[in-house]
Amino acid sequence: MSNREQSLATPYLQFNRSQWAALRDSVPLTLTEEEIVKLKGINEDLSLDEVAEIYLPLSRLLNFYISSNLRRQAVLEQFLGTDGQKIPYIIGIAGSVAVGKSTTARVLQALLSRWPEHRSVELITTDGFLHPNKVLKERDLMKKKGFPQSYDMHSLVKFVSDIKSGTHKVTAPTYSHLTYDIVPNNNKVLEQPDILILEGLNVLQSGMDYPHDPHRVFVSDFVDFSIYVDAPETLLQTWYINRFLKFRQGAFSNPNSYFHNYAKLTEEEAVGIASQLWKEINGLNLKENILPTRERASLIMTKSANHAVECVRLRK
């Protein structure tokens, strides 16, 4: 099969790093190096070059899509003869644990909010819609946290449905990675943002991923543009272990940390436990529930070493 035939056989346009970077088209970099340092994750090297070459072209593309969506809404309002109702544009970001979804979400939030249109951009993670630990323990699901059955999907779907219905005030629960649990009485209130970035393992999942909990509507039904952050599993496991080691030296040393007992481990013991957690929980969840959703994404960013994006695939 020729390269042209291969290109026609896929629903994606593929760009290497330099091809994608060229699509920036003189969009100015509005983030300083100090601001970028604050946006990156605990185990990531996020450089000015990465933001300029990968995230600026992406923010330019998203700005085009969002503007097009607003024009479509205006056409519908003109047809119906109604006053404009503000309907947020939802960007979904999916991918494995440790791949850097949160950094991608934070960078896009910062860039999109600084476009000349000055749109309001909110960021919500689906972690807040995990069942509380009390419920997970009752259902013997603590070792399945992040798997489809560990989420309160009805609440998550209602949340995105309310957002897309133009509800003026919508609340979302928050999750603490320190206590490894939902934070009681600490809901985040969203008041009709222009853009909602929804980040989580499960934003691209659909009915086939929830046979235990049949319902007809899913988060992916409400997402306008979806991004899957991808990387080879060998890298993902390495990044997960390295992140675990950094947490052991930092967050785990906090007496309030759910994983405080891990702070006393030797490095060899910590690597062993992190490897086991990857094999039994995160790697398994990746293979069974996350990776199969990759080809549902509007755009796939594939990372190489040091979290540098080497390839971008954009749905035609």
UniProtKB/Swiss-Prot annotation:
Coiled coil: none
Swiss-Prot/TrEMBL keywords: ATP-binding, Coenzyme A biosynthesis, Cytoplasm, Kinase, Nucleotide-binding, Transferase
GO molecular function: ATP binding; pantothenate kinase activity
InterPro entries recorded: P-loop_NTPase (IPR027417), PanK (IPR004566), PRK/URK (IPR006083)
A GO CC annotation given for this chain: cytoplasm
Location(s), subcellular: Cytoplasm
Pathway linked to the protein: Cofactor biosynthesis; coenzyme A biosynthesis; CoA from (R)-pantothenate: step 1/5
Catalytic activity reported: (R)-pantothenate + ATP = (R)-4'-phosphopantothenate + ADP + H(+)
Residues annotated as binding ATP: 95-102
Gene3D superfamilies hit by this protein: P-loop containing nucleotide triphosphate hydrolases
Superkingdom: Bacteria
Biological process, per Gene Ontology: coenzyme A biosynthetic process
Enzyme Commission number(s) from the entry: 2.7.1.33
Family listed: Belongs to the prokaryotic pantothenate kinase family.
Name listed for the protein in its UniProt record: Pantothenate kinase
This protein's encoding gene: coaA
